[in-house]
A protein has these predicted regions:
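Glycine-rich phosphate-binding loop and adjacent beta-alpha segment
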Residues: 239-299, 338-341
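Mid-domain Rossmann-like dinucleotide-binding core that forms the NAD(H)/NADP(H) cofactor-binding site
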Residues: 133-213, 218, 233
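NAD(P)H dinucleotide-binding glycine-rich loop of Rossmann-like/cofactor-binding domains
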Residues: 91-167
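Glycine- and charged-residue-rich phosphate/anionic-cofactor binding loop of Rossmann-like
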Residues: 281-283, 295-319
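Glycine-rich beta-strand-centered segment in the early N-terminal region that forms part
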Residues: 22-38, 49-96, 102-104
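C-terminal capping/lid region of NAD(P)-dependent oxidoreductase domains
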Residues: 226, 263, 302-307, 319-341
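Short N-terminal strand-loop motif that marks the start
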Residues: 1-62, 123, 208-210, 337-341
Length: 341
């Protein structure tokens, strides 16, 4: 069986190809995609050949934020899944010749391993989670990014007594702010882009600050009544920004490294010692958190639909990734609509 797939054949090149799928095995399900979302950071670094430790090689099929409908089940998978089930999955089985990659989500149909003995086997991944009835596919496909934010929030044990600063209001940072408020925390967010600041003010934050136009340190001091933040969540991926964020913390505060920090990095750890700071290093996300975020979306408690800035057909993949590489400031949520393919 063949599938349409978005492919990175080499650094900075994007193609739509027909690929031959692996055969359906006992615990596999076949999924016809509705939508998939681009992870701006992860897929940008993959496309430019800058992923760490060679975890992505070329050619590869990117994507790990996919939602679709089950159309076939292997002999054992039929005990858990039924044709017509809508699922959110991390990665599909990789077609021959496209290995060296942990993603493989931008293709339809997709062969997905649903073996419960293998799902969530490493830090909650991989996963196949059923989508709540009535939840739109394009919103459900962003649940994985919200789940990334969940991991950092869970590890930092953020609670209703906390005053939290979130630096960076891309999808992960915006979701982090909303989820912190769901836990009862008060939240100040910061970004340099007016559109993101406005979205944050409307949907995510108690206080939203444009750090190019306002004194961020002063606004944080006002927000925390001079005590400093209980938790700072960094989604900027900038160690230069981290150095500033250390000063935003109260004594014994927590700093969540929620971005990706490619080497080389320089960080003055002595400043963190002087704050008696706790550092939290989340990575990835879990099926449990994806299910939790989709449930919140269904209940109207987590709103990510307003963050979708662009929708593309798979045939427009090169145009979509041109935005990712060259005009990231214009984007937040980028969705591929596979039903039109």
């Amino acid at each position: 069986m063949n599938a349409k797939a978005i492919v990175f054949p080499e650094p900075k090149r994007v193609e739509l190809r027909t690929v031959e799928l692996p055969k359906l095995k006992e615990w596999d399900i076949t999924v016809e995609l509705e939508t998939s979302a681009i992870s701006l950071g992860t897929e940008r670094w993959a496309l430019t050949g800058q992923r760490p430790d060679g975890d992505v090689t070329f050619p590869c099929i990117p994507g790990y934020l996919s939602v679709g409908k089950v159309v076939d089940c292997g002999a054992s998978a039929g005990s858990i899944y039924s044709c017509g089930d809508r699922v959110n999955f991390l990665a599909a089985e990789i077609p021959e010749g496209y290995g060296g990659n942990w993603m493989c989500g931008h293709l339809t149909p997709a062969i997905v391993n649903g073996d419960p003995s293998k799902l969530r086997s490493f830090a909650g991944m991989p996963y196949v989670e059923k989508v709540p009835v009535g939840l739109a596919g394009e919103e459900a496909s962003l649940a994985g990014l919200a789940a990334v934010a969940c991991r950092g929030i869970d590890m930092a044990a953020i609670c209703s007594e906390d005053r939290v600063v979130v630096v960076g209001q891309g999808v992960i940072g915006h979701a982090a702010a909303q989820i912190c408020r769901l836990r009862g925390a008060r939240v100040l967010t910061a970004d340099t882009m007016p559109s993101r600041v406005e979205l944050s003010r409307r949907y995510a934050a108690d206080v939203a600050v444009n750090s190019l136009e306002e004194d961020l340190a002063g606004r944080i001091a006002e927000f925390t009544e001079g005590r400093g933040a209980d938790v700072v969540i960094d989604t900027s991926g900038s160690t230069k920004m981290i150095q500033q964020e250390v000063e935003f913390l109260k004594l014994y505060g927590k700093l969540v490294f929620q971005g990706w920090y490619p080497p080389p990095n320089t960080l003055d750890l002595h400043r963190m010692q002087l704050k008696f700071a706790q550092a939290v290093f989340p990575c990835g996300h879990s099926g449990d958190a994806v299910a939790r975020c989709m449930r919140w979306m269904k209940e109207g408690l987590l709103r990510l639909q307003p963050l979708i800035t662009h929708r593309f057909r798979p045939e427009q993949a090169a145009e979509a990734y041109d935005l990712v590489l060259n005009r990231p400031q214009e984007t937040m949520g980028i969705i591929f609509n596979w039903e039109a393919a």
